[in-house]
Every structure is written in structure tokens, then in C-alpha cells.
Curated annotation (Swiss-Prot):
NCBIfam families: PRK15439.1. GO terms for cellular component: plasma membrane. ATP binds at G44, G45, N46, G47, A48, G49, K50, S51. This is Autoinducer 2 import ATP-binding protein LsrA. It is found in: Cell inner membrane. It comes from the Bacteria. The complex is composed of two ATP-binding proteins (LsrA), two transmembrane proteins (LsrC and LsrD) and a solute-binding protein (LsrB). It is a peripheral membrane protein. Belongs to the ABC transporter superfamily. AI-2 autoinducer porter (TC 3.A.1.2.8) family. One of its GO terms (molecular function) is ATP binding. It is an enzyme of class 7 (translocase). Gene3D superfamilies: P-loop containing nucleotide triphosphate hydrolases. It comes from Photorhabdus laumondii subsp. laumondii (strain DSM 15139 / CIP 105565 / TT01) (Photorhabdus luminescens subsp. laumondii).
Amino acid sequence: MLHNNTAVPPLLEVSGISKQFSGVMVLKHIDFTLFPGQIQALLGGNGAGKSTLMKIIAGLEQPDKGTLKISGHHVSHLNPTKAHQFGIYLIPQEPLLFPNLSVQENILFRLPKHQVDKSKMKQLLALLGCQLDLHVSAGSLNVADQQLVEIMRGLMRNSKILILDEPTASLTPVETERLFAQLRELQQQGVGIIFISHKIPEIYQLADQVSVMRDGTIALSGKIRDYTTDDIIQAITPAAKDQPLNGTPKLGLDLSNNQHQTVPDRPILTVTKLSGEGFSNISFSVKPGEILGLAGVVGAGRTELAETLYGLRPAVSGEIKLKQHTVNGLKTAQRLAQGLVYLPEDRQSSGLFLDSSLGWNICSLTHNRNTFWIRPAYDTAVLERYCQILNIKFSHINQPIKTLSGGNQQKILIAKCLEAHPAVLIIDEPTRGVDVAARNDIYQLIRHIAQQQVAIIFISSDLDEVVRIADRVLVMHQGEINGELTKQQMDVDTIMHIAFGEHKPQQAASC
């Protein structure tokens, strides 16, 4: 690590950076410094300005005021090509790979010919302690390996500054530790790393410096060892401390007029010996008002199962019953009309229409069902109702959803699912890329929805939140249910053991 040497000049100096969009100041006189061999965690609430600051550093946005110095050189009119030339590489939360190209082709894509060095690529893989098959398609990799490919793309371009945006959002603890080991190795080589995260415990494992943004300013900055968790949470937002889930939150959300009639003590969804791509022989049931957790490592088959239940993938065998009626032969739209609603893991590519307005997105599942015509006034009324209920922050009603922060995008996606009046709501990674305060909003909302007799299947890689939210949990391993735990039985360690197939406990009583 080089950053302890005060004689070493900074890799990056940001001075007085300001930026506004549509008259709204999103960055206000930001100062930020990164040294060689330093891992600096960057935290902040949704809309705090983290993404805008990183886009400016990566050349994707231009500042209105302020200066950037890279390795001591003043830089103006930075664009992505120049940023790469200066050794800056941004690794997005969702890896941007070509799924049909090989790993090697993705790593070398658009690399200048004089930098195409396959022996160097293999040396870097060895340095990171990885054994990637360079000839398989990138689309066949799990998220952890896709992120490694993105890191390799940066290193092959001689990057000295790596920006990682929520890299552990969909990783298991084991995959997270493997990534951390790789980042520590890069740190030893003098690479400066900006590590954006909403998971406070993990920054204490990895970072040596921390900066917290709030309302477009730096609210806290310094050595990580000088701050407690409470200090960081307070800097993110004074009201962001975890709230207990006891009692009924007064959110103003009323699903009592839900068109789907349910019987509280009778399972509303029953799955029997279901097999499909990525999973086999799955059987379970869920009752109205129950939150059923679905845990497992990446590749265990959770998302594949959810997409099959919703009709996005075909079932090979087995039966799905919704309200005592088999739905195997029904299309997705028909299952939706019967009250089966799915909130996908990837909100940007699968859940939202990024160039469309907020209200249009919320009502998009019901437009075709209710009327051929799109009704702007109706969409606006629905938007205003959900924005008040879910505390969604936006500038104007016609604002494209792609301009919102990740947490507000996720709340819009939840509102879209609720507007479809679910009887069964399948939620896949609902807090991915969401800050502490927004997570608590979502936890409270999920509990409130369940209290109104909606059955919820809750998929998450964050085992702490599975334990916190779920009434019961099914743990998948290699495409099968390897264990079932009641609320009293579940804890993170037990779930982890089952998820890795180490033991299969006695099954909890089926509900």
C-alpha cells in the first residue's frame, strides 16, 4: 500500500465540483481525494450525488464548476475515452458485458492493438487468484465472475483508478470475500479504488478511508477507523437508524379492496414437484399474509424458479396452483390478471421503462387491462398517491424514471406491482443498491403489504434481511430445496450452511 507515504501525490483530486440538473443542485462544491493503494468507501443516501460525482470522474458528465486533477495533471472536458487514457475505469452495478461473446473477447473488446497482450491477461488472472475459462460465453457466468471480467477490462487498459458501484449487491458472503481478496491484491499494486456501497459492515472489512455524501455535499470524510457505524449512519441521514418491524406502520396504503378474494388459512399458491431450467423437484406452499423467504447462493435457481412461477420460463414438469386452480398453461398476462405479480431483480432492464414518466411506469401493468387508451390524468393521480405513501422523491411528474436515484426507482417498481393488486407478490432482491433509509422504508412496506393478506415470496442474497423479514425460509442449493426453517429456527449461519449443502436439517412443518 502506497497511500501511507505522504510524499506520494494523489491519483485523483476533485476540487469545488458543482453540478445541477433542471435547476436542481445535485453537487455542491465537492472536494474529494484518492491516493495510490487506497480503498476509499463512498456512501450516501439515494439522491445524495454519488452517481453524478462518479460519472464526472469517469467522463460521463461534465461539471458546471470546479476542477479535476489526475496524477497531478489538470484535466478539462473529460470524456470516457480520455478517462480510460488517464487510467480511470468505472465498473457499474450491472456488468455491461456482451453475453454472446467469450470472456476473452469481452476483456479485449475495443482495446488498442498495441495493448492486446494475452499473456498479460493470463498473468493478471493469476495475480487475482482466479481460474476463469476465457473461452466460455460471458452470459454463462454468474454475477461475481462477470464483475471479475469488468475488473480485468479495466486492468488491461492499465487503469490506476477503479470505481466499483455496489459490487456486492448480488453476491453471497463467500463471493464477496473472494472479491475483497482480489481488491486487496490490487491495492498492494498501487491501484486506487473507490468502493460505493450501502452495506456499512463490509466497508469496515475492506476500506481504509470513508466519505459520506448527503444532499450533494461531503458530510463526513476521513480514516474509517476514526468513525463508528452510528457516525456513518448519522452522516448519511439523521433518521436512518434501523427501525423495528413491530406493529403496523401507518403508511396509508389500503389493499382491502383487492379484487382477489383469499382464505387466510388456505394456501393461495401451491407448487408441487416443479422442475425447470436451473431447478428441479420444487414443492412448497404459501398462505395469504405470509412472507416466505427464498435464500441460496448465486446460481442456486431462485430467480429461475420465480420466473417460471410468473410464466417467463416454461416448466418442464410439475404443477403450479394459484387459488386452487392450475396455471401452468397460462401466459404471464393471464397469471397477472389472476393476481400473481413479479418484481424482478434487475429493475433497469426488466422492471422499468427508463425513458418513460413515473406515472406511466406505475400504471404500465394495468394500462392494457383497464383500457386501450393511456390516461395521463389518471397516471398523475396514481403517482401522487404512491409518492405520498412511499416517500418517492422527484422533480416533476413527466421526469423520465432513469433520472431518479436507485432507491426511488425501486419504490416506483414496488408501486407498479401494488397497482396491479397482487394476491401473490414475488419480490426478487428488492433492496439491491438501496440505502439504509430506503431499505427501512421497503422493509416496513413489505410487512404492511403482508398484513393486508397478500402472500409474499421474498428472494434476497442479504441473509440478515431474510432473517429480519421472513416468517419462514426455503433454502436452495444447486436447484433444489435443501432445507426449510421456521422463524424460530432461522439465523444467518444456519442458512449459510444449508445454502452450501453442508447439511440438510429436519424439514419444518409445511404451511
